[in-house]
Amino acid sequence: VGMNVTVEGMKSLDDMINEGVRRAYNHPENVLRASVLADPDGKRANTKDNTPAVINYSIVPGDTLEINVAAKGGGSEAKSKFAMLNPSDSVVDWVLEQVPKMGAGWCPPGMLGIGIGGTAEKAMLLAKESLMDPIDIHELQARGPQNRSEELRLELFEKVNALGIGAQGLGGLTTVLDVKVADYPTHAANKPV
């Protein structure tokens, strides 16, 4: 959201976004199912329109509003992992330990989004946001890494695919189509991933 953006109307931006989601999922040509449940630890009643949406904001300079939408199933969330590693622990080793445990529930081949640093919450958000970037691992392979995050991307892409998990966990050469890594400064005592 640009700092100079003015939104007209009597609704909050969240309410406007949720109205857009509601209209999209209730549109006669929509082929995506409604999967959001209210009262998740109680009645688990389907909202029938996938609202309320999970909304994250970044306030940036400018006068434009950009909205990225990710309509996704539950597998990507169900297989999410978080760890507060020791600063000396290897992110590569941790990822290579976690991916085989995920089974086929994340519907490979897919993309891995890895957030490193900040706080627990920030690391998870970095991972999710990184998945909005285009698949470009082959371009990165061609030009070579320019920083530690890109080195991690290349190393994990090679090593995760070498696990042989393959499509739908049935074995094969391609488990990930790309690996995204985003990092953020963190406290010296921690390495949230």
Where are the regions that the model predicts?
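Active-site glycine-rich loop that binds ribose-phosphate moieties when present
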Residues: 49-53, 84-101
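Gly/Ser/Thr-rich active-site loops/lids in small-molecule metabolic enzymes
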Residues: 13-17, 21, 88-94, 123-153
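A generic, well-ordered mixed alpha/beta core segment in the N-terminal half of proteins
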Residues: 1-61, 68-70
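Conserved phosphate/anionic-ligand binding catalytic regions in large, soluble enzymes, centered on
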Residues: 1-7, 105-125, 185-193
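Structural signal for hydrophobic packing residues in well-ordered secondary-structure cores
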Residues: 17-29, 59, 71, 95-106, ...
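C-terminal edge-of-domain segments
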Residues: 59-69, 172-193
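Active-site-proximal helix-loop elements at catalytic-domain edges
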Residues: 62-91, 156-157
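Flexible, glycine/charged-enriched surface loops at secondary-structure junctions
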Residues: 26-39, 101-113, 138-149, 163-178
